[in-house]
Design a protein with these regions (language model features):
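Alpha-helical transmembrane segments of multi-pass small-molecule/ion transporters
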Residues: 1-279
Length: 279
């Protein structure tokens, strides 16, 4: 949870007037990007989990990570891919706020369907989930934003330091969970790894197609592909292990595997772009 708070504070320190102006300046790109993050990805996750006949705990975990947009490194990946960095910041901010309301609804619907199909009872305290998202997402985001407005120079310095620490911190968190649930991850890696890999690739392909249909610029298309593919694993893990919500490390396992695979796949995507442009 502390890592999630730091990541959201970091996002807040990076928000500027341009991020909000971009919503009105480039509404089509923002709308398509948010739709890909909030609607497309959870839908693909649900379909994959159903087709692969995943156990309820992993079914919920896969949909959960799909409902947590706004990866902490998406802006860096967008820059490396020569995408629209301003759009990346806007999408991360907007989706982080929108998910406060969409995540509880989607997870509540998923829990009902999974409970009915599996013949078990999965209780999801929607109110507590909403409150936790406010405390862990919205509050630190706003604190970071106000800090930038109050002390812009110091905020910029803090942002540079936190940006260097964010990725290693997230990977450390994933590693600690991996060590704690090593045997279970190994036993189920084929199923969960396949589901996460297919989810990432399918979401990237669908978001690219969506962007092309919308006739967005090449830079915007690349950014949307990255934004849709990169998720906030820290948020998913915080919800999964929270004693007020799922209180289950098993639900967090898809998020852990997703976090590892998404960086490998997106780095490969960025490398392929850079390699193609050198020719």
């Amino acid at each position: 949870m502390p890592i999630l708070i730091v990541l959201m504070f970091l996002l807040g320190t990076e928000l500027n007037k341009e991020a909000f102006v971009n919503v009105t300046r480039n509404p089509k790109a923002v709308l398509l990007g948010v739709a890909g993050q909030i609607v497309l990805l959870p839908a693909i996750a649900f379909i994959l989990a159903w087709l692969l006949d995943m156990p309820p705990v992993y079914f919920m975990g896969l949909v959960l990570i799909a409902c947590c947009p706004g990866g902490s490194s998406s802006n860096v990946f967008s820059m490396l891919a020569k995408g629209d960095v301003a759009l990346s910041v806007t999408l991360t901010a907007v989706s982080s706020i929108v998910t406060l309301f969409t995540l509880p609804v989607i997870m509540e619907l998923t829990s009902h369907i999974v409970s009915h199909n599996a013949g078990i009872s999965i209780e999801l305290p929607v109110g507590k989930l909403f409150v936790q998202n406010i405390v862990l997402l919205f509050v630190p985001l706003m604190v970071g934003w106000f800090f930038r407005r109050w002390k812009p120079i110091q905020a910029s310095q803090v942002s540079k330091v936190l940006n260097k620490l964010a990725f290693p911190a997230l990977m450390t968190l994933a590693l600690l969970f991996f060590l704690q649930y090593t045997q279970e991850i190994i036993d189920n890696f084929r199923l969960i790894g396949m589901a996460c890999g297919l989810l990432i690739l399918a979401s990237m392909a669908c978001s690219s197609l969506l962007s092309r249909i919308g006739r967005l610029t090449q830079a915007a298309r690349r950014t949307i592909v990255i934004e849709v593919g990169m998720q906030n694993a820290a948020q998913a893990i915080a919800i999964a292990v929270s004693p007020f919500i799922f209180n289950s490390g098993e639900v967090a396992i898809p998020a852990i595997i997703y976090a590892l695979l998404m960086n490998v796949i997106l780095l490969t995507y960025v490398y392929a772009i850079r390699l193609r442009e050198r020719r």
